Amino acid sequence: MNYNEFKDYVKEHVLDYLPEQYKNANMDIRQAVKNNDVVLDGLTIFNPNGNMSPTIYLNSAYEEYQQGMDIEDVVGKIADAYIEHIEPREEYRFNFDLQEVKNYEVVKDFIYPKVSNLQSNVNRLSNIPYTQKEDLAITYHIWANGNEESMGSITINNDLMELYGVSMDTLHDQAMNNMDKISPLKFESLQETMVGMLASDFAKEEGISIDEAKDLIRGSIPNDGPDVYCLSNEARANGAVYIMREDVQQMVAEKLGGDYYVLPSSIHETLILPKSENMSFQRLQDMVQDVNAMCVSEEEVLSDGVYQYDAKSHTFSRCDRQPELTYKQAQGMTNNMEVRELVATAENKQEYDSTTPNHTHEPIKHKGH
């Protein structure tokens, strides 16, 4: 079936995979402008309790269907993702209704930042408050529900900002201060990042413990190249924003003993390399662009540049020293950037994925079905 037929099928059948209280739930499929002005189709199943309802994006679900996943499994996976976000769980830190979103005092402790590219988000940034750093934009979001690995969020737009009645500085400081408790910093060698990513699957395949798997993986990864570190958060989701914090910039400089390069691997993490005379900025930039073009999904690209931190002056800047773009300047530039780059070390995150184990999904047959 084509994409439009797929959307119709999902809308017609997804309620069969949900508990009975959802059998008469209203649904809607709307387009949403996401990071890098990527437009996705989002399915919203309105919560019968009147609380916030998550949006499950169908584009990546259709890709899995095209790759051979059974349509019933695809629809079941979408239903799992919905339940994962909507049902209160002990480990979930916050669930609230629509009216509470409008109250700054209620949501302020659950506001967190994300970072994106200014030029690639002209449309999206036209209706949301942001703070510019070099050619990057820090935006602000409310952790609506979910746990650290499955975060449902609401973007703070200009209308909400007006209702809150707080300054940009207040909003920015609140979001930055919340980062450590919402999803703490993770700074480690790239080798350890790869070990952590591969260990679980490898342990299952080989029937060994996680620690044994990690030891075997460490032994198979070459470590004779330059020192490379990964900066993200524990959830490895939208963790690149940590490099925007001045205290984190200084912490990294202290650990590495001086200046360093920052490679924008994706919106989820950055790679850090200590500066050396043998390291060519142009070579790094070429690598960033090539890997981004081949490995990073369009929605997860952060930047086409390489950045640097000067430990003496405590300054973070883009290496080619382009003047900072204002939003109006960015509006006048094409969004067809040369080559979408970046070094991605984390797996692409599919927004409709649930954290439940994969299994064969059978529809829940409600009365009258």
Task: Say what each PLM segment does.
Residues 4-223:
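Extended, low-hydrophobicity segments enriched in charged/polar residues
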Residues 240-254:
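Short amphipathic alpha-helix segments
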Residues 265-303:
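C-terminal structured domain segments
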Residues 226-240:
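Short glycine-/aliphatic-rich beta-strand segments at the starts of folded cytosolic domains
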Residues 329-369:
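Non-Sec secretion/translocation targeting segments of pathogen effectors
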